[in-house]
Amino acid sequence: MVSMTASSGRRVLLAAPRGYCAGVDRAVIAVEKALEQYGAPIYVRHEIVHNKYVVQTLERKGAIFVERTAEVPEGAIVMFSAHGVAPVVHEEAARGKLATIDATCPLVTKVHKEAVRFANEDFDILLIGHEGHEEVIGTSGEAPEHITLVDGPGDVAKVEVRDPSKVVWLSQTTLSVDETMETVDALKEKFPQLISPPSDDICYATQNRQLAVKQMGEEADLVIVVGSRNSSNSVRLVEVAKLAGARDAYLVDFADEIDEAWLEGVSTVGVTSGASVPEILVEQVLEWLSQRGFEDVEIVKAAEESITFSLPKELRRDLRAEAAALVEQRTGNGPSAE
């Protein structure tokens, strides 16, 4: 075990901003409000956000997370996660007589609308993102015949388009800014007339958290990122920290996952968290470090954030009654249309 004292000059650099973004905050509150208004169970298609603690907490309150719409009983309420879903999922829910709440992050919805717009104009769309990620699946589903996935610079060589003068790039919102631009540069070299999206697709929170980590990584020997392994933006923070100069960087869900061996020879620890991580988990990491002599905490502030999103409009309706009416229509027990 590493021997430490409070006077050893050890310090913590705490990133700001960190943790919940506006889209995650909106989605989590939406589940809590739905449970409060309609009672359990509330079904959620896929994890509402990619964080183990958040999902487990909501499960205890009565949320049931499913991977397929077919797993939701007829007449139930189902919420779509912050990552967004393809149009076919909305169609499945309608066929299943489900009342739906769409908690898709508005910034993801923006990318969906861009995909539809460019598809309607018959562009080839090069979607920069990670294969299999829920957000990529949802966006691709908006225009599957027009979208080609580009999973990093290594994919560029094999990309083919119908007309090099009608090609546009879009991106997953949670990517590394630097890697995305590296991919874009490679695409522009191959397709000089490549069009950029009308506004930046990588979300403000992803960019701000990466900027703070870059500043931190210049001074930190070790960076601890609080986040789950299936969280794209959290994984990217580990990568950014290493590229910024940190000797080591690790991803943990909880403080008890930290290995004391990581602290050998370390005087400065950087701490941040992904956009789907509640602050309580960061506080537990800070307490863990404090108990081992890292009591001096300095804030590394990269940006101010004040963005908020309104809750899904469906939470202003009586969804239980709507779901029951849908089932009655199917069984023929509902009121006559005559």
Swiss-Prot record:
Pathway: Isoprenoid biosynthesis; dimethylallyl diphosphate biosynthesis; dimethylallyl diphosphate from (2E)-4-hydroxy-3-methylbutenyl diphosphate: step 1/1; Isoprenoid biosynthesis; isopentenyl diphosphate biosynthesis via DXP pathway; isopentenyl diphosphate from 1-deoxy-D-xylulose 5-phosphate: step 6/6. Its EC number is 1.17.7.4. InterPro entries: LytB/IspH. [4Fe-4S] cluster binds at residues 21, 105, 203. It catalyses: isopentenyl diphosphate + 2 oxidized [2Fe-2S]-[ferredoxin] + H2O = (2E)-4-hydroxy-3-methylbut-2-enyl diphosphate + 2 reduced [2Fe-2S]-[ferredoxin] + 2 H(+); dimethylallyl diphosphate + 2 oxidized [2Fe-2S]-[ferredoxin] + H2O = (2E)-4-hydroxy-3-methylbut-2-enyl diphosphate + 2 reduced [2Fe-2S]-[ferredoxin] + 2 H(+). Dimethylallyl diphosphate binds at residues 50, 83, 133, 231-233, 276. Coiled coil: none annotated. It comes from the Bacteria. Its cofactor is [4Fe-4S] cluster. Pfam families: LYTB. Binds 1 [4Fe-4S] cluster per subunit. Keywords: 4Fe-4S, Iron, Iron-sulfur, Isoprene biosynthesis, Metal-binding, Oxidoreductase. GO terms for biological process: dimethylallyl diphosphate biosynthetic process; isopentenyl diphosphate biosynthetic process, methylerythritol 4-phosphate pathway; terpenoid biosynthetic process. Catalyzes the conversion of 1-hydroxy-2-methyl-2-(E)-butenyl 4-diphosphate (HMBPP) into a mixture of isopentenyl diphosphate (IPP) and dimethylallyl diphosphate (DMAPP). Acts in the terminal step of the DOXP/MEP pathway for isoprenoid precursor biosynthesis. Belongs to the IspH family. This is 4-hydroxy-3-methylbut-2-enyl diphosphate reductase. It comes from Streptomyces avermitilis (strain ATCC 31267 / DSM 46492 / JCM 5070 / NBRC 14893 / NCIMB 12804 / NRRL 8165 / MA-4680).
